[in-house]
Every structure is written in C-alpha cells, then in structure tokens.
Amino acid sequence: MLLTIDIGNTNIKIGAYQGERLTAHWRVTTERHRLADEYLVLLHNLFDLGGIDPRHIDGCAISCVVPPLTGEFRALCHKYFRVDPLMVNASTPTGLQYKVDAPAELGADRIANSLAAFRRYGGPVIVLAFGTATTFDVITATGEYIGGAIAPGIGISADALFRLAAKLYQVELVRPPKVIGTNTIHHMQSGVILGYAGLVEGLVRRMQAELGTSCPVVATGGLAELIAAETEAITTVEPYLTLDGLRLIYEMNRQ
C-alpha cells in the first residue's frame, strides 16, 4: 500500500492507495511546529478510523511546501513505516520538461498536479489549484511545463478585507443570492466569490490566447467546486489530483 502526503500551508492531504485505487483519504490542518511523533499519533488515529493497517504500507510519496515539516515527515516515515519516502521536487523524474527560469522554485504540489492532469487529459492543459494561494500551471501537448501564475487565495482575500477594513467582518465563503448585494455580507461574498470567478476567467482566457488554442482547464483544491460552479472557464474538478500525481511519480521512480 502506498501513502501519499501533500503538505500545504493550510492543510495536509493524505491518501492511501492500493494499486491505482484510492482506498482512504483525509484532510487535516497544517501545524508547522508539530513534531514527527505528534503527527505519528494523528496518523495512527486516522488509520484506526479508516481501517488501514500501517503494516501494509510499503511506500510513501510526499510533496511539501512547508520546509519545517519536510524533515519531520521524513523521520515519521522512517520510524513508523520503515520506508524511505520519495520527497518530490523539480529534480524528481516525472517525464515533464520544465521550460521556466528556475524549475527548483516550483512547488512539489504543482509538479504533481501538472503530471496528473497531463496524464489524464493530455496537453495543452491548464491546472488550477485553489489553496492558500491559487496557482495556475500550463503544460503543452509535448509535456512541457511552460509556466503559470500565482494569485492570492480566496481565503487570503477574504481575510484581508476582514483584517484591514475596520467596518468589515468575516463572512462565510458561499455564493451570494445575486451579484448586486443588498447588505454588507452579500457585498463581500459577491466581491470575493464572484470576483474570483472573474479572475479565473480572465487569466484562463489570456493563457489560452497565448497558447493559441482552447484547452481543458482542470481545477483542484478545497474551494474548486465553489468557483467551478460560477464559471464555465473550468472544465472539470479533480479533488484528488495532487494525491494522484504523487502516486504516478512514485510509480515512475520505484526501485
């Protein structure tokens, strides 16, 4: 059994694979000051709830954009599973060709997303990941990663309004009843949710214009469904795209 772990700034996504089948998955809050033993206890509880026997785990693939946790999860895999985890980065063989100025700066999650989308949909393809930041990644028909964009995440945008505007407050991130709101809550929801859909439409349109063709737009991340419901720019939502990408990378690099 393969364990895939995507460590983001806000959440950690964990998936257990039996072959190509995702048999269990979890999402927990990222606590960057936790130690390996603390995460071990958390994993043990999750495995109990999911009916997963840790003795069956014989491989682990990890993407991490939180440097303090890289060593902790490596230690966890050594101690708990007796495996040497595959820590994904731009040097990990994936079959993708990086046509950007500094490939080493690419987050491992973006690499996993790009490979999974390219394998599933071919290219060109645009990948959107809605996380702490929202990332856009573009892969060509020949498997070249040619770049993308990074925008402030939806949560960051909403929090900035709450923290920096004295008379505004936190609101639930849901679709407002209509675009033209009639109270402050609906005003903010319209600006954040529908405004973000407009941001997606604008960047996708510009990227496809540079590519010279339309192409699939694949979205993943916690708020992908919310934004996809508000725009036709997103072709499909793949909730487990990053975990699937980690599985694919692991299979490519198995000894």
UniProtKB/Swiss-Prot annotation:
Gene behind the chain: coaX
Reaction(s) catalysed by this chain's protein: (R)-pantothenate + ATP = (R)-4'-phosphopantothenate + ADP + H(+)
Species assigned in the record: Roseiflexus castenholzii (strain DSM 13941 / HLO8)
EC annotation from Swiss-Prot or TrEMBL: 2.7.1.33
Subunit note: Homodimer.
Catalytic-site annotation from UniProt: D109 (proton acceptor)
Function: Catalyzes the phosphorylation of pantothenate (Pan), the first step in CoA biosynthesis.
Cofactor annotation remark: A monovalent cation. Ammonium or potassium.
Protein keywords: ATP-binding, Coenzyme A biosynthesis, Cytoplasm, Kinase, Nucleotide-binding, Potassium, Transferase
Entry cofactors: NH4(+); K(+)
UniProt name for this protein: Type III pantothenate kinase
Gene Ontology terms: cellular component: cytoplasm
GO molecular function, one term: pantothenate kinase activity
InterPro entries per record: ATPase_NBD (IPR043129), Type_III_PanK (IPR004619)
Residues bound to ATP: D6, I7, G8, N9, T10, N11, I12, K13, T132
Family per similarity comment: Belongs to the type III pantothenate kinase family.
Record lineage: Bacteria, Bacillati, Chloroflexota, Chloroflexia, Chloroflexales
Gene3D superfamilies: 3.30.420.40
Residues engaged in binding substrate: G107, A108, D109, R110, T184
Pathway membership: Cofactor biosynthesis; coenzyme A biosynthesis; CoA from (R)-pantothenate: step 1/5
Subcellular location: Cytoplasm
Biological process (GO), any one: coenzyme A biosynthetic process
